[in-house]
Amino acid sequence: MERYSNSTREVAQDGRRGALMLSVSIKHPDSESFIDAKMTEGKVTGANVSVKLDDDFMKAVVNKTTYKQQYPVDSANPTTVKEIDAATLWQKIIHNAWKSAEPGVLFWDTIIRESVPDSYADLGFQTISTNPCGEIPLCPYDSCRLLALNLYSYVVKPFTKEAYFDYELFVKHVRLAQRIMDDIIDLELEKIDAIMEKVKSDPESEEVKGS
C-alpha cells in the first residue's frame, strides 16, 4: 500500500497531484489490517482507503453472528478460510473512520446491482473499484469522467422576488455536457491503447510491468 501511495504522490500534472483509491473486500482475511492502514500518522498519505462491504457482512452485523472470510475472495475452493465476529469488525471500521476519516465504506453488492457495466458482464465488463472520491464505480483501465454544472448560474435575477431558474438553458447545457462526456470516452479508449503499447515496449521485466 505504501508503494502505491508513494508512487501516486510523485505523479503531478499542471500542479495537481495524483489521486488513488485503494479498496479491498471485507471478505478478504487481511481486511482488518487494511482497515487499520491509516491509523499510523504519516502512512498511506497518497491514497484514499475504502472497504467493500457485502450484504452478508451487514446482515451478520445486524444479527450479531459470525462472518466467513476467505482467500481467494471469489473462489469456490479457497485456500484460506477464517471466521470473524462481524459486529466487532464493524465497530472497528466506525472507530477508525471517526479517528482518521478512513476507511470509507463501499456497499459493494448494492453498487454491483446498480452498476451499468455489470449488466454487460457476459462481454467482459466488471466493476472492481471506484474513482478516488468514490462517486463512480469503475472497470479495469477505466477513469473517472466528471463534469459539473454550476446551478447558481442558471438563476435569473437571484435574490429578488422575480428570481427564477432558466430550465431551457439548463437543459441545453446538460445535453451539450452529455455529448462532451460521451466523446471523452472515445478519446479515452485511444489513450488506453497508447498506454498499453508503451508498457509493452518498456524494457522492465514482466514482473514490474504486471505490478
Residue ranges and their predicted role:
Residues 1-173, 180-211:
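Active-site cavity-forming subdomains of large catalytic enzyme subunits
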